[in-house]
Each structure stands twice: as structure tokens, then as C-alpha cells.
């Protein structure tokens, strides 16, 4: 059983067929089994919907369908961004003034630490700077 965190990069590449990473991400998706578990956050899903909001009706519809599906999928843990989690992310954001981490990245990193996750479906090298293993280098 794999335990994976899923970043905005992955969801967008999965949906957007013109994304240069689409083929690799789609192929990886085929390897996810019923025993695997994945985590993402409300903040990540907000980024996905925001990024695809002006990409046309079809893609917007697919993005909403993806989010709706993730929210009910028993393999997927969509972590709610509570005030406490927001403040944890903000604390990391504040502690790394020399980095270019987004607040969403900081929230994701805090969730990964809390859940003991080490692998993330992203190409964002910021995660390697915090000791995580990105699966799309």
C-alpha cells in the first residue's frame, strides 16, 4: 500500500490534456491500486478550481466533477483547512522567508508531516527542500 500526497500540479496535469505532464500523470494514475491511499487538501482543490476557472466550460465541468469525486472517494483523504491548519501553514510560511513556498505548499507540507507522508505527486522542487520525495522530478 502506497501513501501519497497529491499536489495541485498532478490534478491539473491529469485534467488538462495539453499540459506537458499529462501523459506521464495519466499513466501514473493507472498504477494507483485499491490498496493505495492518497491525501490532498481543500487548499489544493481551491488552487485547481481557480487555475481552471477560465479554461472553458468543458474543463471547468471536469474540474468540478473531479473535486466532487475526490470528496466521496474512500481512498482519498481531503484534509479540511481548519483555522488551526491554516495557522500551522502560516507558521511554516513565516519561518521560511528565504524560500518561495506558497501558503498552499506550506499547508501541504504540514499535513504531510502530521500524516507521516514522504512521497508527493508533484514536480515542485520546494518539497524536496523540506525532505519530501517528489515523484515527477
Predicted regions and their residues:
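Short glycine/serine- and small hydrophobic-enriched flexible loop segments
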Residues: 50-54, 113
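Active-site neighborhoods of divalent-metal-dependent phosphate/nucleic-acid chemistry enzymes
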Residues: 76-119
